[in-house]
UniProtKB/Swiss-Prot annotation:
Record carries keyword Signal: no
Function: Binds to the 23S rRNA.
PANTHER family listed in its UniProt record: 50S RIBOSOMAL PROTEIN L15, LARGE RIBOSOMAL SUBUNIT PROTEIN UL15M
Organism: Ehrlichia ruminantium (strain Gardel)
Key word Transmembrane present: no
Subunit: Part of the 50S ribosomal subunit.
Family assignment from sequence similarity: Belongs to the universal ribosomal protein uL15 family.
Protein name: Large ribosomal subunit protein uL15
Example GO BP: translation
Amino acid sequence: MDVVMKLNNIFSGLPKKKKSKVLGRGIGCGKGKTSGRGHKGQKARSGVSINGFEGGQQSIFTRLPKRGFNSLPKNKYSIINVSLIQRLIDSGKIDNVSAITKEVLYNLGVISSVKQKIKILGDGKLNTTVCIEYDFISKSAKSQVTLLNSLSDSESK
């Protein structure tokens, strides 16, 4: 017997995707009336999902102990060495006569914001006396700099 291929006997194999069941179209369809949700109750209503609720059983995140802690955010400040200030004076970008404020340092691109706190460290050597605004200062830098302080000396670190 010779089988002739015709359009009516082409078989493409099993269906790739199972068709979804139509819900709520009468009791004869098998998923009518309550549409597989059971009778009444919170889960039968719309917008049901209760996160972390396990049917009255103590939920997993209350069963497990608390772990660790959240540390407070660090005070971020820019560190400026005395050698950098001397380099800026030598290059002529800063004159040592007027006070060096946060605005001056911001305009030169030394700090990223005028509101940022500044800590001056004593790495390097200053050849001239300088009046500078700061928030924190090290002892070695304090001996080299004439201070225009934004905090009192008792608060400096």
